[in-house]
Amino acid sequence: MIVIEKNIGPKIDYTVEETKLTLNDEMMLDLSKYEREFDVHIDICYNQFGMLVMGLGERYVAQIDIPAREYTYEQNGTDEEGNPKYEKVPVPFDMDKVTLTLWSLEG
């Protein structure tokens, strides 16, 4: 995972285990479940009650950017004319390509 500290100050505690990101022992996201055919951007904020929410809130805590799903093409038999047929196969989710941007908890 690529981690960017957006500004100066203390950041939220986080842990990563396989494809799961846990923030402050309060919110867990299995990031592989959010992978799509297009780039995905997830905002994590504190709401007015000091609870973590996904989406916009009172104050940014983190942003997660997941790149679009990638594919390979593998030969899968031949057609009736003897030409090779190819199957579109998704590449396994790669946490090393996910970007986590952390915002200061102060301010």
Protein language model features and the residues they cover:
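Cysteine-centric segments in proteins
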Residues: 1-107
